[in-house]
Amino acid sequence: MSRDRFRSRGGGGGGFHRRGGGGGRGGLHDFRSPPPGMGLNQNRGPMGPGPGGPKPPLPPPPPHQQQQQPPPQQPPPQQPPPHQQPPPHQPPHQQPPPPPQESKPVVPQGPGSAPGVSSAPPPAVSAPPANPPTTGAPPGPGPTPTPPPAVPSTAPGPPPPSTPSSGVSTTPPQTGGPPPPPAGGAGPGPKPGPGPGGPKGGKMPGGPKPGGGPGMGAPGGHPKPPHRGGGEPRGGRQHHAPYHQQHHQGPPPGGPGPRTEEKISDSEGFKANLSLLRRPGEKTYTQRCRLFVGNLPADITEDEFKRLFAKYGEPGEVFINKGKGFGFIKLESRALAEIAKAELDDTPMRGRQLRVRFATHAAALSVRNLSPYVSNELLEEAFSQFGPIERAVVIVDDRGRSTGKGIVEFASKPAARKAFERCSEGVFLLTTTPRPVIVEPLEQLDDEDGLPEKLAQKNPMYQKERETPPRFAQHGTFEYEYSQRWKSLDEMEKQQREQVEKNMKDAKDKLESEMEDAYHEHQANLLRQDLMRRQEELRRMEELHSQEMQKRKEMQLRQEEERRRREEEMMIRQREMEEQMRRQREESYSRMGYMDPRERDMRMGGGGTMNMGDPYGSGGQKFPPLGGGGGIGYEANPGVPPATMSGSMMGSDMRTERFGQGGAGPVGGQGPRGMGPGTPAGYGRGREEYEGPNKKPRF
């Protein structure tokens, strides 16, 4: 470590030479460059005392002399230090220091001064390890005054005010007896100083710069430069010593001052830290944090009462009864209340001894007959319906098993009263098992403070009972006989209690077994009821289904009926239409009877052909037609016998066949025109120029 630090900071002793110029001229500059010089001295400081402990104390008194004695005096003594270096105290750290010495011969001068005192270093090394690092720098200048160092070492402490700055605690021991050895150690300190003094040296270099670190005070009366002096040339040390003294003198007063002020402020403004004294999840300002303060002076004010507890945090509610001399105060946490109780109990106040106790919890309830599966959280959740709860605890035995009892503390009395009344009148169950909880007011006992002798009532009965000290009764005496009777009575009570407890336990077991059987039966009944209910629901569903099916069937029937009715209506319409058409046809046929004979003959077909164009039809007949019908037929002439009609028809047919209508036309035409017995003029179809009245077609 020392070698690495030395290389990184100064690159060897050359760094010191460059800054210090080899002599005293660079001393101040060396001090300005703490990293190289101080690093070496710090690491070597402790080692210096081991091998060359006698040198350190000398530097403080000769700071002025050191300035006068630059490098020339130290070179010769450098050789002796090597002999002192061999001591076993500095084996590890001594090795790194030699390279700096080689680089700069002036550095070993410190040991030169120490050779004379080298005999002292071993003893002194053990006692003042702290001094060597600090004084390691001064020893360089000290070599000239080596003989007087013991005395001057103490003297330099007072003259240089550096001692206070360096550190109040460290200075006195160093100045006492060990200062001379550190001086010797300071001589070798340049090389070995970094070893033992490294830790302090590191602190001290930082200390001098800021202005009075504790590490710098370690040297005591000696100047701070010794740290750096261990590795730096003597001349530089001489200049540094005074500079360090001046630098330390300024800061020392400031350093101790703030510390004392801080202590005073801490003692005055001390207040307990709630975050450290409160458990996780603990509620603040509860009834458990409420203190009873008795024996208060009659003239105490509320402000005084609050100031009494000011250091224990901000108080909650405060109540004082001046007439009876007591009061109540609520603090933030139970821990703060316990601290306040322990500190203020029996505290004198205006000639009275204060009595501080925890106030009884007026809103606390005791809960019994709890199931072993009830926890604190379940208990709090169950009773939180009655009001805000401060604490809910299930009491357990030494193995952590539930005792069936618990405590519930409410934040207010109305909530506790409501819970007590509701649970007493009704049945409050916490678990599946029908096991109701039993709630009672909590019986609060003081098992912490008890009854001290000072609070006992010194009445005549007390004096009488306390006349005889504690003792064991002698056999056969009056005391022994009646004491035995008391013991037998207590034994009988114990037996009866055990018997009652046994009977109660048997009764509880029996009740639990009955409850178990009844519970199973109850479950079976519930299952049966559930089954019946499901069956009923199924039956109802079937009925609903059947009703639905019936409705569907009815709807289908209605639809079918409507369809048939529509079909029938359609058939009826068709029939009506057909009937109407038939009637129309019949009407048309009936009207044909009133038609012109020619039309009827034309419609009749064959009957009309016989008379049409038959010139002989009328002439062949024996009797002319009565009504003048156009044709010869039985329909028009019912009076004509059928034989005649047939004969005439036959004759006409024959004529028609023999003489076509075309050829007989003129003959038949001439005959009837001039002949009376012929067919009337208006009926013969052979007369083409005639047009009958019904010439217009009907269809």
Curated annotation (Swiss-Prot):
Region: Disordered, residue numbers: 1-265, 571-699
In terms of InterPro entries, this protein maps to:
NOPS, Nucleotide-bd_a/b_plait_sf, PSF_NOPS, PSF_RRM1, RBD_domain_sf, RRM_dom
Q: What quaternary structure, including any partners, is listed in this protein's UniProt entry? A: Heterodimer with NONO. Monomer and component of the SFPQ-NONO complex, which is probably a heterotetramer of two 52 kDa (NONO) and two 100 kDa (SFPQ) subunits. The coiled coil domain mediates interaction with NONO, and can also mediate formation of long, linear homooligomers (in vitro). SFPQ is a component of spliceosome and U5.4/6 snRNP complexes. Interacts with SNRPA/U1A. Component of a snRNP-free complex with SNRPA/U1A. Part of complex consisting of SFPQ, NONO and MATR3. Interacts with polypyrimidine tract-binding protein 1/PTB. Part of a complex consisting of SFPQ, NONO and NR5A1.
Covalent cross-link Glycyl lysine isopeptide (Lys-Gly) (interchain with G-Cter in SUMO2), where: K263, K271, K330
Provide the RRM domain boundaries: 289-361, 363-444
The answer, when asked if Nucleus is one of the entry's keywords, is: yes
Q: What is this protein called?
A: Splicing factor, proline- and glutamine-rich
UniProt lists compositionally biased (Pro residues) regions at 48-102, 120-163, 175-197
> Does the UniProt entry include the keyword Transcription regulation?
yes
At what positions is Asymmetric dimethylarginine found?
Answer: R9
Instruction: Indicate where this protein resides in the cell.
Output: Nucleus speckle; Nucleus matrix; Cytoplasm
Annotated Basic residues bias: 236-247
Sequence positions bearing Phosphothreonine: T360, T679
Q: What is known of its domains?
A: The coiled coil domain mediates interaction with NONO, and can also mediate formation of long, linear homooligomers (in vitro). The coiled coil domain is required for optimal DNA binding, and optimal transcription activation.
Single GO MF descriptor? RNA binding
Q: Which residues carry this modification: Omega-N-methylarginine?
A: R9, R228, R234, R237, R673, R685, R687
Annotated positions of the N6,N6-dimethyllysine modification? K306
Segments crossing the lipid bilayer: none
Pfam families, from UniProt? NOPS (PF08075), RRM_1 (PF00076)
Coiled-coil-forming residues are: 489-588
Where does this protein have compositionally biased stretches of type Gly residues?
A: 9-26, 198-220, 604-633, 660-684
Q: What does this protein do?
A: DNA- and RNA binding protein, involved in several nuclear processes. Essential pre-mRNA splicing factor required early in spliceosome formation and for splicing catalytic step II, probably as a heteromer with NONO. Binds to pre-mRNA in spliceosome C complex, and specifically binds to intronic polypyrimidine tracts. Involved in regulation of signal-induced alternative splicing.
Q: Do you know which SUPFAM superfamilies this protein is assigned to?
A: RNA-binding domain, RBD
* UniProt entry keywords in alphabetical sequence: Acetylation, Activator, Biological rhythms, Coiled coil, Cytoplasm, DNA damage, DNA repair, DNA-binding, Immunity, Innate immunity, Isopeptide bond, Methylation, mRNA processing, mRNA splicing, Nucleus, Phosphoprotein, Repeat, Repressor, RNA-binding, Transcription, Transcription regulation, Ubl conjugation
Q: Which GO terms describe its biological process?
A: activation of innate immune response; alternative mRNA splicing, via spliceosome; chromatin remodeling; chromosome organization; dendritic transport of messenger ribonucleoprotein complex; DNA damage response; double-strand break repair via homologous recombination; innate immune response
